[in-house]
Amino acid sequence: EIAIPYEVQVEAPYAMTSMGKIRNLFHFANLAKNYYEEAKRLFFSSDFADIFLTGNPYARAVYEGLKKSSCQDTAIEEFLVSVNKKARILLSLDRDRLEYVDFKASLGSSITITKSGWGYLAVEIEIDGEFLHIDKKKFTSEDFSGSIYQLFYTIEEDKVHIGKNMGRIYIKTPYQQFSVEILVKRNRPVLQQGRAEQKRALIQLTKQYFDFR
């Protein structure tokens, strides 16, 4: 018999991507950060579990539960957060209260929303106050310019009454909720003030007349 030496090289499973060969969840997280659509296709492919989750029963259980989600973007985000490969996106606001004094006409303004980090996040807006109007009541992390989103709102003049008008804008994510208080003060028009003063003076004069009698 002749012994023929040979060497067998066994290569771990991998996925060929725009970043080259990737073999683990750390690599996959980097792919999701830099080539998100490619990472999404890979995440929902039949090969994902065999390449990235072999020997990791916890990650496999999380994956099996999330891949059936109605929102694919949320599934990927929750998976990466659950396996500690990215931080959850959190929001912060530049203010929590706005006050408008001596309001006279419709006006528009905005609230600056800042997000931390990368990934997918869905945001919902609710308003309390008939004088407030917002065009867009749902948006996602894709609508941010860098880390900033400007939430525009309008105060509608024809729905603001004399005196104090209180309203709120609620900003909600699956993990956070914010409330921005809006206070609008509208004074009585000068002409109406003059007429009101005349009426009060007439009432006072009439009262004095009857008291004198």
Where are the model-predicted features located?
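Feature for long, exposed domains in two main contexts
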Residues: E1-R213
